[in-house]
């Protein structure tokens, strides 16, 4: 979603410029199945997942995602790209991926929100609360309810500068 508007590329460029971390020159699209092929220590550190329609994974994909988040120490950044239904589907998916881990709301003073005076919401498709899933004191999944990818896209979806700047900051954190 929003790949044609360069949302992923813009976020990658912002991240490289503002953190000094080495990044790929361009974003990579990967399926959940492809995550299984990465050995421990070589998988992507973070996967961005967005959508607005149906979200369904096979049992094998659910197991792959569980392994990516726990054994391979990956992180999932999920962004509700357009519907209350996607919100429910994502939470249901996470109950299957991490059945013993309940989502927690992320307070504004949490380190993942460092440098942001407010939670940036472009469109509140999934409400106005961010959630995280924590395993062994590490955030393994972060859910953003408000279409952050639109703010990363070319033109920033017309949202005010403070909002899209905070969206980049959140993506970088």
What are these regions (language model features)?
Residues 84-172:
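An acidic, glycine-rich "communication" segment
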């Amino acid at each position: 979603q929003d790949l044609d508007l360069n949302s992923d590329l813009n976020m990658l460029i912002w991240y490289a410029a503002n953190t000094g971390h080495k990044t790929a020159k361009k974003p990579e699209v990967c399926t959940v199945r492809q995550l299984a092929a990465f050995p421990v220590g070589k998988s992507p550190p973070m996967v961005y997942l967005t959508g607005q329609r149906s979200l369904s994974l096979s049992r094998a994909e659910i197991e792959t995602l569980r392994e990516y988040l726990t054994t391979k120490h990956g992180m999932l950044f999920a962004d509700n790209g357009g519907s209350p239904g996607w919100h429910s589907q994502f939470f249901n998916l996470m109950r299957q991926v991490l059945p013993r881990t309940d989502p927690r709301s992320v307070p504004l003073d949490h380190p993942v929100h460092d440098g942001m005076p407010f939670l940036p919401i472009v469109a509140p498709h999934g409400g106005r609360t961010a959630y995280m899933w924590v395993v062994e004191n590490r955030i393994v999944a972060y859910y953003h309810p408000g279409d952050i990818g639109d703010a990363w896209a070319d033109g920033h979806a017309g949202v005010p500068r403070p909002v899209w700047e905070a969206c980049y900051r959140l993506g970088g954190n």
